[in-house]
Amino acid sequence: MKKAQIKKSVSALAMAAVIAVSLFGYGCGAKPASTSSDAGVSGDFTGTAKGFGGDVSVTLTLTDGAITGCTAEGKDETQGVGSEAIAKMPGEIAESGSIAVDGVSGATVTSTAIKEAAAAALTAAGLNPDDYKTAVENNATAEDSTVDADVVVVGAGGAGMTAAITAAGEGKSVVILESQSMVGGNSVRATGGMNAGKTVYQDENEFGESAGVEKTLKTAAEKYADNETITALAKTVSEQWAAYQANPTGYFDSVELMELDTMIGGKGINDPELVETLCANSADAIDWLDEHGITLHNVSSFGGASVKRIHRPVNAEGKTVSVGSYMIPLLQENCEKAGVKMMLDTTATEILTDANGAAVGVKATGASGEIVTVNAKAVVLASGGFGANLDMVVKYKPELKGFMTTNAPGIQGQGIEMAEAIGAATVDMDQIQIHPTVEANTAALITEGLRGDGAILINEEGQRFIDEVGTRDVVSAAEIAQTGSYSWLVVDQAMVDASSVIQGYIKKGYTVTGATYEELGKAMGVDAAAFAETMEKWNGYVEAKNDPDFGRTSFANPLNTAPYYAVKVTAGVHHTMGGLKINANTEVLNEKGEVIPGLFAAGEVTGGVHGANRLGGNAVADFTVFGRIAGAAASDYAA
């Protein structure tokens, strides 16, 4: 088993999340707006508006009717997304004297709430908010600039920041170029956790997933007998499973079982070498995150995994939280500690090459149109896939026209296109994943972890229709085939009590509720009697640990603690499995299969890791494992 050699940089970091900001005289290069204010009004006035996660409040300081200060609070806004708007916009309002400042890209709901709350504060002061909506002219100018670095990273998501931290830990100077006004990319939107095989945290759980292992081995034998990689992995896992049954010590999992699950999930078209690299380095990646103050110790079930393998963060109360909004601020903190230079609102447009075709830097465009040239010894592309570029999605998969997307606005495929321009090869570009649990009204991603923790899916007829913890492609296809192409994700109060994530969904207004099964059925608008019967039947299946209807093998607890909740979900574009062709050292390859010197890539910008379908939890594993490898490889190349 090959295992990428990655040097560890040990530092335990802690981060205090600040989401209340008071800024006066904030300098942003904007021209102060003129207003027709009441010159007699001075003091502090507060307004409130509905944000993404809860209420957002804004307090304006008025001096003779002019805005001279602004603070904002929104403790329930998503860390790393809405919190960025709360950190940035108050200062711009204070300096410009206008509430018509630009919002933060990717944090539209929170940005709008800040403006509405500011308007409410003006109303509370007896003023007309319309008098404070003068458009803010950005007269800031910037000159073209050149920056020199050992390593330049394109994209400040999970893969990019992991690569930067690793390279900086090797003593290299690192610059990150990020097209958006905040870090995180798609990574900050990740809700579940990180898959890792054979970790010490799995051993803290009692093993009860025999049926899952047997089901996977049966699938390998019946559906993939002609796939040499899957057959060989299944043989190894069968031997490991027999040995474990003879001496059941600890929790059963292995690198090979994780590989087998990943290959089956990807329908056998994954690059076996990349899958092996992903899985062999996953447990070490959990340890690396620990060393950097990022703890993913709660282990649970997830779609497509034979055993409990997904590692999740919890809050101070022990409740699970979304992995992306937890990890990204901590990775950003690690970047700052490591001395990484972060250039936001700077969009990479071209990979610079020398006479021999080696990557030697990146050209980018800044927020004011200035040209930024970064000369570097190595280039790491970590700019994400193309799930937010719906034209590009439809180009490669026309049947997805009209689908909503869970992707961040900056996920446009630029990294792929830049690399193609210098001869890079791509793979699996038509493999685009749709996710079955996307909130039907807002396109917000509803975590797959709920199904792993016991939630079920119900159709308009009040019935289950699929093994809820199957792979995303299978569950999505079944959901699309239902009446109206949607379903309801059902949980009970016991699940709510254990998850701050579900509590967040309730606060955001995603759920309907009922004190009884019949009441919830009516609230959902499904056949209430049939739904009640389905719930009673399902609870019996959980007690018996047997699902004769759809063969589900992952069971948690019965859904029998009132009240009950449901979220209406549908399928949406979620992940692009295709991208740049790389080897196990994250070196980008050209059409001849040759390495493009100095060019590395990690994360969703690459292809081959996930095949035809990505398993939930493997994206975080992907960006952590390959981000580390890319950072180390780029560092070695730049030596």
Per-region residue spans from a language model:
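Active-site- and interface-proximal helix/loop "cap" or "latch" segments in soluble metabolic
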Residues: 36-136
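Beta1/beta-strand and adjacent pyrophosphate-binding region of the FAD-binding site
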Residues: 141-159, 175
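Glycine-rich FAD pyrophosphate-binding loop
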Residues: 169-190, 207
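An anion/pyrophosphate-binding glycine-rich loop and adjacent beta-alpha core
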Residues: 220-234, 412, 416-420, 425-528
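Conserved redox-cofactor binding core of oxidoreductases
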Residues: 253-370, 389-391, 542-561
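A glycine-rich dinucleotide-binding beta-alpha-beta segment and adjacent secondary-structure elements
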Residues: 350, 530-613
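Glycine-rich loop(s) and the adjacent beta-strand/alpha-helix scaffold that form part
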Residues: 367-439, 626-629
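Internal hydrophobic alpha-helix adjacent to the cofactor/substrate pocket in enzyme cavities
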Residues: 418-425, 527, 532-535, 622-639
